[in-house]
From Swiss-Prot:
Catalytic function, reaction form: L-glutamyl-tRNA(Gln) + L-glutamine + ATP + H2O = L-glutaminyl-tRNA(Gln) + L-glutamate + ADP + phosphate + H(+); L-aspartyl-tRNA(Asn) + L-glutamine + ATP + H2O = L-asparaginyl-tRNA(Asn) + L-glutamate + ADP + phosphate + 2 H(+)
Keyword Nucleotide-binding tagged: yes
Gene that encodes it: gatB
Task performed by this protein: Allows the formation of correctly charged Asn-tRNA(Asn) or Gln-tRNA(Gln) through the transamidation of misacylated Asp-tRNA(Asn) or Glu-tRNA(Gln) in organisms which lack either or both of asparaginyl-tRNA or glutaminyl-tRNA synthetases. The reaction takes place in the presence of glutamine and ATP through an activated phospho-Asp-tRNA(Asn) or phospho-Glu-tRNA(Gln).
Organism: Brucella suis (strain ATCC 23445 / NCTC 10510)
Name used for this protein in its record: Aspartyl/glutamyl-tRNA(Asn/Gln) amidotransferase subunit B
UniProt entry keywords in alphabetical sequence: ATP-binding, Ligase, Nucleotide-binding, Protein biosynthesis
Length: 502
């Protein structure tokens, strides 16, 4: 199969070497565990964290005479994912045996798909940025294919000083291997691609995307070349299990290859591992070619066939996907592309935001969700589903600001109280005397007191006749009133009394 270069060399993506510029070329093979209660060819459970070898059927253990039976839900999930990737759905596909020996592969082969996968070419649009101007760059990344295959078991080498153990709980679990074209040109693009792919499968409900549990793993193919030149020899970095590590692995590997080539050496085609502690890759084995696995159609499984009506029925029930949702939020709620990009990263966050924004100013809601709520959740190590503040409570805080009942500063304090103690924001404001002071007489007295106490500042303000110093006086008045004074009223009174004009 010939590889087509679809990207024009971009100098901002180049890596500077001792002998000139280099371009990194990246392709990714992402293994995503299919969300299904049972395995690809058996009825054994896929539950994470079970006791070793407790989720193993006779099929998974490769007992003689046990035949695989396709799990239709795994087929549906693969088709849903293919539709979400704007990909060609193949109405006929074939399962093949990929032959190799390893202790955690009891059959002596893996059931996969080689020449006829269930999903063909597709594409993903990623956003890279923001740059120093706050702008994002959209880049289209091609999808080569998606195929279904079995996962292997797990070898454990730390349970006994002289023996290794095998846990077959993962053996036979359904995986979708999603193969990109070699269209990625930087570690930033690779991170954005993996983030976007994880977002899509989570929206679809076809994979939970939990990389720390092994539900999503990436094999990263990296090569370097002179800008616009022929593709270089690639090295595959296996089983990278975090988006951050993907970026680190690419940056190290690209530099390693450039150093070898600039010293007159050649790159060996090999499989490597990434060591996150040392931040470097190391050689694992020479890279296998397809013929090394002796693929042939599995004689125990008929070709997988379905009609277009099957595909159409699944497509009709797909949820709104992140790109469509982002565009809708920008157009209907008037928020920035940057804010929308953050909000749609997780479906649960987008749902929370839309509940808060319903009937309210979209920009104000976005500001509170992104800066205050997500900031607090991140600090506490919580997910949006674990938020102590409900959309209704956060919406009530925003309403109190809009009504003029509380100031922005008091709203921050109220947010902390609701976060820690719960309760109805409106009642809390009443019970704790947090209402904003709107009585002009009371505010004017506070302004007069601050002016009287700072004659030197008054002279400076009047001499300059500029509004810049007014902010200092406003701050002092807000401090004196415990943040309860209406900031707009304070600002107007300060400027009036100091004779400052806009």
């Amino acid at each position: 199969m010939s590889i087509i270069d679809t990207r024009t060399p971009e100098p901002k993506r180049f890596i500077s070497g001792a002998t000139g510029d280099w371009e990194v070329v990246i392709g990714m093979e992402v293994h995503a565990q299919v969300t299904s209660e049972s395995k690809l060819f058996s009825g054994a459970s896929t539950a994470f964290g079970a006791e070793p070898n407790s989720n193993v059927s006779l099929v998974d253990a490769a007992m003689p005479g046990m035949l695989p039976v396709i799990n239709l839900e795994c087929v549906r999930q693969a088709v849903r994912t293919g539709i979400g990737l704007n990909a060609q759905i193949n109405l006929k596909s074939v399962f093949d045996r990929k032959n190799y020996f390893y202790p955690d592969l009891p059959q002596g082969y893996q059931i996969s798909q080689f020449k006829q996968p269930i999903v063909g070419e597709g594409k993903i649009m990623i956003s890279v940025g923001p740059d120093n101007k706050g702008q994002f760059e959209d880049v289209e990344i091609g999808i080569e294919r998606l195929h279904l295959e079995q996962d292997a078991g797990k070898s454990m080498h730390d349970q006994h000083p002289t023996m290794s153990y095998v846990d077959l709980n993962r053996s036979g679990v359904a995986l979708m291997e999603i193969v990109s074209k070699p269209d990625l040109r930087s570690s930033d693009e690779a991170r954005a691609y993996l983030t976007k792919l994880r977002t899509i499968v989570r929206y679809l409900g076809t994979c939970d995307g939990n990389m720390d549990e092994g539900s999503m793993r990436a094999d990263v193919n990296v090569s370097v070349r002179r800008p616009g030149g022929e593709f270089g020899t690639r090295c595959e970095i296996k089983n990278v299990n975090s988006i951050r590590f993907v970026g680190q692995a690419i940056e190290y590997e690209a530099r390693r290859q450039i150093a070898i080539l600039e010293d007159g050496g050649v790159i060996d085609q090999e499989t490597r591992l990434f060591d996150p502690v040392k931040g470097e890759t190391r050689s694992m084995r020479s890279k296998e070619e397809a013929h090394d696995y002796r693929y042939f159609p599995d004689p125990d499984l008929l070709p997988l066939e379905f009609d277009q009506a099957f595909v159409d029925a699944l497509a009709a029930k797909l949820p709104e996907l992140p790109d469509v949702k982002k565009q809708r939020l920008v157009e209907t709620l008037g928020i920035s592309v940057y804010d929308a990009s953050i909000l749609v990263t997780e479906k649960a966050i987008a749902d929370y935001y839309e509940a808060v924004a319903e009937g309210r100013d979209g920009k104000a809601a976005a500001n509170w969700v992104i800066n205050d709520l997500l900031g607090a959740l991140n600090k506490a190590g919580k997910d949006i589903e674990e938020s102590p503040i409900s959309p209704a409570q956060l919406g009530a805080i925003i309403d109190l600001i809009k009504e003029g009942t509380i100031s922005g500063k008091i709203a921050k304090d109220l947010f902390e109280i609701v976060w820690n103690e719960g309760g109805d924001p409106k009642k809390l404001v009443e019970e704790r005397g947090m209402k904003q002071v709107t009585d002009t007489g009371a505010i004017e007295k506070a302004v007069d007191d601050v002016i009287a106490a700072n004659p030197d500042k008054v002279e400076q303000a009047k001499a300059k006749a500029k509004p810049t110093l007014a902010g200092w006086f406003v701050g002092q008045v807000m401090k004196a009133t415990g943040g309860k004074a209406n900031p707009q009223a304070v600002n107007e009174l300060v400027k009036s009394k100091l004779g400052i004009e806009e």
